[in-house]
């Protein structure tokens, strides 16, 4: 502010000390201006002017120090500022008045006026900004104390705002969390309700079933008892028996906890009300009915003798049981008292039933029956007392159960491991839960009462369904007589008259179930017989015969198996009841027969499977034997082939030696013999060349292997024959010529090409070579009559078979004959 003051003092236009503004009259001007501002306060507020700075600056001038050079300058600045503001305000007033006049006079020039107003508003905003800047500058020239106070106030305000916002956020988080928890709990409840509704929709009796945990624990307990029995019989050590007893105790603890949860369902008010209406009375504890005083029970004395219980053990167990008996009596008495109280509450407060006192009051008073159905409203104290008694009943049930289990645990302290195991097996030998029988009973119940009630209209009754088949029947007084008459009309014996008849005999009648309205299932809703209401003391009229009654067979035989069809029904009953227990025994016998048939069928199937397996094993054994025989035959053939080859080699060697000897003995005869009569004999070199040719053919045609082997053997035999004939020629020239001719023929036959044998060659894939080979060997061995080779061959191969004499000269024929002839020769040889 000092530089501003200097500017004002240095400005020539600023008033001098001798000017009229510096006179004492100047002190009156701010008050006058302030009064004018207060008078026009509403107008300034309408135009959004802020006069806080001017108003607050007035006390600062009044509270300023004594007048000096600086004070005069400040007063002059304030006066100039106020003068400017008054001028601007007067201008604004005039402009507003002009605008109002123009708006009233010139309605047609609204757009121009709006533009002018916008321009004026912009000018006014600019003026306001300038004025606010001036006011801020003037405020900055205030005292430092005011700045510090404002800063502290702003800090305090900010801190308060931060704290408030923080608290709000925290409250918001807590609220959101609470709402999420509520939503989660509602969703869980909704899911549980959906599951319950689904169960009730499928089968309303599912909630009354034993849970899967109970069934599992019962079967587990039964299995443990069996294991303990086996351990005792096998005389296992005490450690293993002790481990089994520990597992049994843990499973019993789980079963007791599950039973405590089941008690809550039975103590429910609705369940107790149903039991009260049905007239149910509680009985004693079934877990302790088999023993009351151990000293008086025969089985206990026998157990003590077999288990070798001492006198101390017997005394302690008897004392323990007496204490248990006393406590159980007290609990049973309390349970009966609570049961009587609960029944009385239900029968007097909720389900009002008649008693002698009420009947006497009604007879004595002769008052009319009140129209209202509701009785007196109960007080909260009575309801609370009833709930307390229900909770007390629950606790008593739990206490009885725990007392029994704790007593059994205490008894184990006085017994050894084997004695306890023996007692456990003895008591629980017959304690079991046959859940399969329970499921079968439940399924039959549901089938007769719920599952079949789906498609038939509700107007038809279970005991008397309207049908046209019994319209001609006479009147009767009961439903049982009408049903028996229907059965007799259709040729079916009644249950009372034919106790020995089985349900299968009922299916023999083919005319059963023929009616106009044939229904495949039971009616959906069972309704009572509609009769007119009668007065209390007037006798009821006789029962009229039902018209159009449908046969019972149409209702049951189409949907329920014959083993489960009831044969008679009571009047107006919602469920089917057997009239005679013999029918039920017959059904059981039929079920047993069916089970036996199934078992026989299973046994027969098992026997067939065993027979098939045995046959397969036999077939496999035969196949293995045949394979071994074939292998042996092949080995024998290979051995015979090898022996033939060896014999051929030996014969060739002998022939060579004989030729050399013959050449040395008669060189002149060999030289004089004519060349045209020399028979082409197979020398060893020619034999080797022929084998090479056969091998070449064998490379091109693998299936001719057997034929080449046969050629080799034939060549060897022919060469032996030639050698023998040559030896005879040395002695007889005439015979030599004939033998040479025979040798020529044999050589010509041996030189037959392979192409001529293709028509008669054996099939290699059918293994006919194995059949032809022995025939050729036999024919070769038989063809040499009185020759040296045949004699030597018979000596070397004495085990080789020989053919009959009629086949001695049939070597070539056997070799070139077709396959079927070879097979015939094989058959003849085998014979």
Swiss-Prot record:
GO terms for molecular function: DNA-binding transcription factor activity; sequence-specific DNA binding. Residues 151-214 form the bZIP domain. One of its GO terms (cellular component) is nucleus. Keywords: Coiled coil, DNA-binding, Nucleus, Transcription, Transcription regulation. One of its GO terms (biological process) is regulation of gene expression. Residues 130-143 have a biased composition (Acidic residues). InterPro entries: bZIP, bZIP_sf. The keyword Nucleus applies. Residues 54-85, 97-129, 469-484, 497-510, 674-695, 720-750, 787-800 have a biased composition (Low complexity). Pfam families: bZIP_2. The keyword Transcription regulation applies. Residues 153-173 are annotated as: Basic motif. Residues 87-96, 144-154 have a biased composition (Basic and acidic residues). Its main location: nucleus. Residues 1-33, 54-166, 469-510, 658-697, 715-771, 787-810 are annotated as: Disordered. Residues 101-141, 601-664 form a coiled coil. Residues 176-183 are annotated as: Leucine-zipper. It comes from the Eukaryota. It is found in: Nucleus. Probable transcriptional regulator. Belongs to the bZIP family. This is Probable basic-leucine zipper transcription factor P. The gene is bzpP.
């Amino acid at each position: 502010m000092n530089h501003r003051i200097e500017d004002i003092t240095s400005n020539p236009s600023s008033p001098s000390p001798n000017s009229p503004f510096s006179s004492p009259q100047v002190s009156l001007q701010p008050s006058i201006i302030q009064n004018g501002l207060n008078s026009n306060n509403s107008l300034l507020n309408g135009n959004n002017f802020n006069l806080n700075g001017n108003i607050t600056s007035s006390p600062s001038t009044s509270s300023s120090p004594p007048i000096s050079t600086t004070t005069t300058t400040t007063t002059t600045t304030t006066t100039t500022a106020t003068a400017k503001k008054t001028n601007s305000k007067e201008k604004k007033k005039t402009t507003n008045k002009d605008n109002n006049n123009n708006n009233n006079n010139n309605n047609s020039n609204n757009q121009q006026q709006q533009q002018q107003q916008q321009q004026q508003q912009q000018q006014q905003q600019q003026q306001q900004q300038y004025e606010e800047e001036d006011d801020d500058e003037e405020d900055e020239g205030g005292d430092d104390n005011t700045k510090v106070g404002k800063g502290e106030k702003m800090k305090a305000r900010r801190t308060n705002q931060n704290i408030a916002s923080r608290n709000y956020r925290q409250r918001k988080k807590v609220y959101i969390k609470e709402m999420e928890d509520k939503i989660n709990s509602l969703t869980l409840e909704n899911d549980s309700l959906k599951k319950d509704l689904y169960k009730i929709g499928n089968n309303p009796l599912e909630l009354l079933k034993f849970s899967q945990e109970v069934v599992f624990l019962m079967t587990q307990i039964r299995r443990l008892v069996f294991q303990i029995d086996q351990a005792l019989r096998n005389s296992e050590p005490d450690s293993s028996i002790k481990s089994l007893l520990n597992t049994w105790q843990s499973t019993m603890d789980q079963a007791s906890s599950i039973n405590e949860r089941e008690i809550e369902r039975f103590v429910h008010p609705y369940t107790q009300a149903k039991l009260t209406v049905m007239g149910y009375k509680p009985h004693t504890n079934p877990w302790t009915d088999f023993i009351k005083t151990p000293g008086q029970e025969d089985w206990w004395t026998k157990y003590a003798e077999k288990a070798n219980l001492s006198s101390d053990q017997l005394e302690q167990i008897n004392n323990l049981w007496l204490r248990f008996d006393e406590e159980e009596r007290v609990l049973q008495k309390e349970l009966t008292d609570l049961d009587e109280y609960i029944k009385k509450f239900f029968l007097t407060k909720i389900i009002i039933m008649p008693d002698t006192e009420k009947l006497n009051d009604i007879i004595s008073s002769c008052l009319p029956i009140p129209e209202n159905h509701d009785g007196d409203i109960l007080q909260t104290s009575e309801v609370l007392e009833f709930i307390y008694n229900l909770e007390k009943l629950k606790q008593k049930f739990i206490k009885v159960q725990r007392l029994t289990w704790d007593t059994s645990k205490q008894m184990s302290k006085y017994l050894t491991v084997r004695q306890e195991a023996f007692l456990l097996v003895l008591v629980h030998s017959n304690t079991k839960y046959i859940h399969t029988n329970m499921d079968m009973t439940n399924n039959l119940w549901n089938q007769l009462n719920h599952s079949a009630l789906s498609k038939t209209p509700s107007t038809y009754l279970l005991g008397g369904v309207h049908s046209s088949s019994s319209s001609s029947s006479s009147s009767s007084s009961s439903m049982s007589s009408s049903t028996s008459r229907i059965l007799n009309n259709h040729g079916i014996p009644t249950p009372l008259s034919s106790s020995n008849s089985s349900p299968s005999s009922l299916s023999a009648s083919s005319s059963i179930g023929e009616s106009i309205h044939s229904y495949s299932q039971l009616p959906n809703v069972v309704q009572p017989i509609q009769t007119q209401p009668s007065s209390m003391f007037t006798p009821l009229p006789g029962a009229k015969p039902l018209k159009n009654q449908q046969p019972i067979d149409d209702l049951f035989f189409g949907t329920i198996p014959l083993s489960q069809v009831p044969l008679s029904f009571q009047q107006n009953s919602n469920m089917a009841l057997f009239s005679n227990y013999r029918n039920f025994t017959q059904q059981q016998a039929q079920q047993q027969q069916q089970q036996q048939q199934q078992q026989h069928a299973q046994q027969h199937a098992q026997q067939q499977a065993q027979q098939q397996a045995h046959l397969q094993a036999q077939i496999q054994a035969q196949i293995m034997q045949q394979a071994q025989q074939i292998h042996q035959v092949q080995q024998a053939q290979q051995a015979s082939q090898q022996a033939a080859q060896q014999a051929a080699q030996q014969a060739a060697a002998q022939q060579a030696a004989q030729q050399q000897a013959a050449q040395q003995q008669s060189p002149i005869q060999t030289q004089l013999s004519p060349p045209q009569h020399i028979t082409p004999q197979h020398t060893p070199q020619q034999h080797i060349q022929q084998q090479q040719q056969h091998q070449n053919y064998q490379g091109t045609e693998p299936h001719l292997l057997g034929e080449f082997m046969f050629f080799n053997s034939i060549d060897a035999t022919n060469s032996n024959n030639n050698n023998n004939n040559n030896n005879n020629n040395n002695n007889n020239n005439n015979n030599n010529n004939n033998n040479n001719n025979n040798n020529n023929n044999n050589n010509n036959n041996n030189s037959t090409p392979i192409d001529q044998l293709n028509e008669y060659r054996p099939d290699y894939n059918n293994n006919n070579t194995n059949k032809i080979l022995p025939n050729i060997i036999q024919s070769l061995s038989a063809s040499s009559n009185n020759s040296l080779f045949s004699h030597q061959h018979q000596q070397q191969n004495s085990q080789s078979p020989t053919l009959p004499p009629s086949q001695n000269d049939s070597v070539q024929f056997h070799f070139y004959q077709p396959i079927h002839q070879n097979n015939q020769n094989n058959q003849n040889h085998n014979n």
